[in-house]
Each structure stands twice: as C-alpha cells, then as structure tokens.
C-alpha cells in the first residue's frame, strides 16, 4: 500500500466516522437505535450505495468486529453492578444456555423449511442468529430506568450468551465440513464445558491478576486505561487460543475490575466510553460496507418470515421455557424480555465463520444473518420505549448528576464529585442548605450561581439554575436522587409507587381496619415484609408489584436488598 492509498484510507475512514457521529442525533428524532444509523452509513457508502466502495474482505471485517466486540464487552462488564447478580444471575444463565439452544432449534427448523435446506444447515442458520447482542442491548438499555430484575437479566444474558452461540456454530460447521465424520456426544459435551469453563476461569483469574497489577503500578494517569484495555485483550485472546470463550472472559474481566476499588477507575471508564463509541461506529461501518443490499432481494419474503418467526415465536418460547423455574418474573416481565431479544453484530460475525470455512451456501447464511439483524434493530429496537411502557417495567426516572468525576485521593479511592443542576420543579428550591437531609458520607463541596462560585452558609437558600457539586460515593446516588427529585410530570407517574406508603415492619392486622383487609388467623401475625416475600419471593426489586385483596402493592423502597417501604395504590375506575 503506497502513501496515496494510505491517505485515501484515512480520509474515507475519518469522513465516514464523522458523518456517523453527526447523524447520530437522528436516532432519537426518528425513534430508531443509533447502531442502525452507523450501519446505514456503511451500507450507503458501500457497493450498492452512492459511495460505491467495493469491500469484500471478510477477514478484515472479522478482525475489526472481534476487536470492537471485545472492547464493548470490557466496558459493559465494568459498568455492570455485581449486586444485580443477586436477582438476575441464574435467570440470565438459563436464557444464555437453554434459551439460545431453544431459539436455535426453532429458528433452524423454520430456516430449513423456508429455504429448502438440510436440517443441519437450518440449525446452523439458527445458531448464527441465536444469541442476543451485547453491543445492541447495552446501547439501547443505557440510561433507561428499568425494573432491576428485568434490566439486569437482559444485560447479563447478552454478555454471557455468545459462548453458547459460538459453540453451536463452530460445532455445526465442523459437522457440515466433515459429513463423513461422526461427532460423539461426549466430544460436544467436552467442547461445551471447555468453552464455558475456560472462559469463566480465565476471566475471573485474569481479572484478579489485572486488578492487582493496576493497583500496584504507579503510572501516568492516562496509562491505566491502556493497561486495562491491553490486559483485557490479552485475556480475551488467550482464552480463545486455549479453546475457551474469549467473549465471556473479557466480560468477566470488566465485571471484576468494575466492582473492585481500582486505581484510576474513573479515568479508565471515561477512556473506555470513548473507545466503545469508536468500536461501535467502526464495527457497524465495516459490516455495512460488507453488505450488498441487492443480494437481499431474492430472500426478501422468506427472510421476513424467518425474522418475524424468530421475534414472535422462537424467542418468546425460549424465554418462557427458560424462565419457568423463576416465579419472580411476572408475565409482563417475560413478555418484555422476549421482545428485547435484540440481534446486532454477533450474528453477522458468526455468519463470517462459514465464509472463512468455505462451506457451500455460506453467502446465504451471511445474507440471512444480516437481514435478521436489520429487522431486529428496526422492529424491536425502535419499539423498545413503547414495549417498556406497555409491559410496565419502566420505573419513574430519577435525576442523575449532569456529570460525575472521580477524586483520586488514594490509589483505590471510590470518592466522586456529582454535579447537579437545579431546575424550577425541584423540591429543594427555596430551602436553606442546613435543611437538606444530606445522606451520610456526602457533603456539598461547591455551589455555583450565574457562573459565580458562592461562599454559602447554612442559611443560603437554593434557587433555580444553581449548580451543586456534591462529594460522595456511588452508594449514595439513590439517596441523592431522592433529595434532588422533582414533582412528577403527570398523575400516572406520580401514582406509580402508590397513593400511600407504609414501612414493612407494620403488621397486617394494624392495616386491616384502615384498608378493609380480610385476614385469616395465619395472616394476623404477618408483617408487610412477610406479605412481600410470600408474593414476590426472597429477592424483590424496586417497582415490583402484586395485587392482593383488591389493593395494588408496589415495592417503593430498598436498602441493601431488603424492602423498607411499600406503596399501596387504591383501586380506581380505570385500574386494570
């Protein structure tokens, strides 16, 4: 490659990236996932688009996509709270294993029938599109206030279900490439255990070693993120090299680092945030360039049938069967999880495997995977907000800091500065500082008004437009959100957690005459906490709801996993 070609490559790459960034606000205006914008830019720049760029290098696309996916999973793992595993680990693992297998089987049978394929070829198509995509799920759920059980299940599932899809895809390719060779059940079982076992061991073990290395190293601030990124990629590559799941390993590395006091953690997260955006843009641009839309014309009708069959039948069946043992999921939770079976880059990456293996019909597998991803992002991604509202899994939004930054007081400091901008509707407007019930371990470090730093006293009253800098830790965010909350915009949001609130140590017998409850002898000694456990199980989450004795009960307060307050919503003529 000469200097002129290199400059042309830089020019085109930078131009496409800049266009993708500038067009990204269209996603919110059009109500479509931002990843679809990046993909569309790549398609328009490609062979059939106005850009006319001819790109058919599957090896390069595979390299770029794997690198990007590794970075995205590392960042996603670092932002996942391990506390969410309390309510979501086993359901997510069930979806990541049994769910993928069931989706693969049903989708595979549909593909074999629709495209007149051998049943093994159909299963290969099902395996390629069988897993949800971490990049798509993390991107679309980011910033949404979902029921913790539902949101955590979707995120953990998307970060851990790729190994199953990879295992099924690689196994089926091996069978199809060697039709005369018998694959024993023991061989496949050992391969499965190897993928997951090595992936988990190297992920957690490598994460611990990298965490120790980061905390023991004395480096320039900007180098910690590079150390974490390179260390994560070493573990990712080593896991793949040894026959494990690199995807699972690097996700667990991020999970370990993100939930331990890590030197330079906030700087690392800031750098990874930018790297994740670059990875998403680069990955979907390259995959968009790889697609020739005219190739999809021949599979248009059966492709739609396959995509909607997977969305409306295969995924829901897989979710309902996989979550059968977990009674804490309501039918609405299951319906929403079924709908958010988003497909993204992973199916397209897996579709490159048959191309590189030289399987007959590999181009069809690739085109089908791309078609399913496009339909999934357009239909499921674009309707996510509506689906969350209909399923009632979205919680009323709580105010988040407009910015937050780490305070590196000592190597593993977990202190941060949270910045809040006060609008007119905040409850605290007009209150003197001394009357603010600040959470333990927090302090207002600075107050800005009209671009001027104030020297406040306890009698200083807060005004609309004030900017508060609060020193605290992440564990105080919930309390700070309540402190700086505002009046709900409408009555429906205002009543979400209930009309009246009671503490969970109150006995039902004391509430019976007030709310007209009919209690038997057994219920006389029950507290509200006992009622919640009997209705929702041992691990309720904020926003969990149940109907009991004509009243609607909502979990309205939690502290360290224990329910502290329950809201009671009285029946109305419009109640469901």
Swiss-Prot record:
Reaction(s) catalysed (UniProt annotation): K(+)(in) + H(+)(out) = K(+)(out) + H(+)(in)
Subcellular location field: Cell inner membrane
Membrane topology, record value: Multi-pass membrane protein
A GO CC annotation given for this chain: plasma membrane
Keyword Cell inner membrane set for record: yes
Short name of any one Pfam family annotated for the protein: Na_H_Exchanger
Highest taxon above the source species: Bacteria
SMART domains linked: CorC_HlyC
Any one GO MF annotation of this record: potassium:proton antiporter activity
Keywords per UniProt: Antiport, Cell inner membrane, Cell membrane, Ion transport, Membrane, Potassium, Potassium transport, Transmembrane, Transmembrane helix, Transport
Role according to the record: K(+)/H(+) antiporter that extrudes potassium in exchange for external protons and maintains the internal concentration of potassium under toxic levels.
HAMAP family listed in its UniProt record: NhaP2
Family classification: Belongs to the monovalent cation:proton antiporter 1 (CPA1) transporter (TC 2.A.36) family. NhaP2 subfamily.
Protein name: K(+)/H(+) antiporter NhaP2
Source species of the chain: Shewanella baltica (strain OS223)
